[in-house]
Amino acid sequence: MGIKMAESSSSPRGSSLTRDNDVVLPDAPAISTPVKPEDDTNSRAAGVALEDLFDEDDDQLQAELVFTSSNTIPSSPPQPASDSSSQTIADTQQESYSDSGLMKQFYSRFFPFRSLFQWLNHSPKPGPDFGNREFALTLQNDAYLRYQSYPNSDMLRKDIIRQNPSRFEIGPVYTTNPRDRKTLRKSSMFRPLSKEIVFDIDLTDYDDIRSCCVKANICSKCWAFATMAIKVVDVALRDDFGFEHIIWIYSGRRGVHAWISDKEARELDDDKRKAITGYFEVLRGGTQSGKRVNIKRPLHPHIVRSLEILKPYFQQVLVDQEPFMTQAGQERLLQLIPDKALGDALAKKWASSPDRPSTRKWADIDSLAATGVSKSLDTKALMEAKQDILLEYTYPRLDVEVGKKRIHLLKSPFVVHPGTGRVCVPITTGGDMKRAEAFDPFSVPKVTDLFREVDLFSSTTEGEEQHQNGSAEDRVTPRKINDWEKTSLRPYVEMFDVFVKGLLKSEMTRVKRERDEEGVTGTDGMEF
């Protein structure tokens, strides 16, 4: 699959991109509490056949990849976390979700390390895509450890449990093992090679238009902005750029992250990443900078499509957020009306009805314009202004700096947000926008919920086993059930696994095609 670019080589705004002076993050600062460094012998022991750790599972995975479509949908949709009030270790941790003991149990029992490994490695067998990948750990004492790396999922799991970070982040694949960077003769030899394209959407960037919440707070009304952003960006990434392997992850509190894992995306240089992020820059400046949307006509196809997606949401925004109800909101709207006579007539009408709802004020624009209140009204300019207003109040507000450089680190899926205790679970993948629309951030399981659910599952299972009939010889030994499978985390891990299998299947197909083109036969050297 090649990357499809939109007809225009520039962003939908029609403006050129500028180079920002991004600063490379320095090495980790000295930590106040000594932390035992990773024993390099664990990751470099000579003669260790890492593949042997995975052979049995790899055979099973290859069979699954042959017969499983990447579009398979997990059988169980995400369900709200359990409301069980049973007493567990988690009961005393409601206000301390990053508690050391709680997090250690979470990593050892619930975190899907193997799935994460296969996603980042692009193969079930260890390779440089994982071994040369940077991880950064935020420890319980707030020390920040950069340039951590691991040869396989088992080593990652062991070190995460040992270090017990409050969270960890994922960085790029480097030219060499990040732990060896200081042994190189030239620092220029250590450079990022590849990384997923990532996008970050934070609802605090909507504070000037959301009236229901501010700062870190969210509710179902303002979460609609996240849903709008997912729908607009996802379809553009697929239809305009040709990307396929896109997954959206809940940040744990007030935002969403997009990860684009296609090989073509991972290998893009920083300039091309800036071009892609610039493609989505429609809003510029702040609320005090005048008109924030200045797009050329005729409209770019991406903007035309976005308007169609956003129109129904705009009407709901007028109801939920009442952006024009306040005097400041009303004045902001009037600033965006291109005809002075029409603007003056609207201001006069609204002055006599200060509590007039936003939906009525929006309708007043057309109704007053139709009365001929302005003799010089340019109806085309008014229509374009209304389109720009709709975009200002609904179009995605991306933190574009996050996606511009390969060196940028982003929080890993399935870590726990220390402030809310919620797990950073997948929202949707495969372009399934019904899943995105149905996602409820308040139903996402908290780390404390998981322990209660395991206890509830165990007690229920034991009761069922006591009522089973038949002799021990007649029973089939069931496979061991992972703890995450006993909780409301299960459908999210299943969704992630379907995404990973689709990616691995694509990688397998690509490798086989490349080998066929080179005239190589057999399986020697195959990554799979």
PLM feature spans:
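Residues forming anionic-ligand binding surfaces in small-molecule and nucleic-acid pockets
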Residues: N71-P74, S84, M189-I218, L283, ...
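SsDNA-processing nucleotidyl-transfer enzymes
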Residues: E95, D99-K215, V400-V402, P418, ...
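Histidine-centered divalent-metal-coordination microenvironment in nucleic-acid enzymes
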Residues: E196-F199, H245-D271, K411
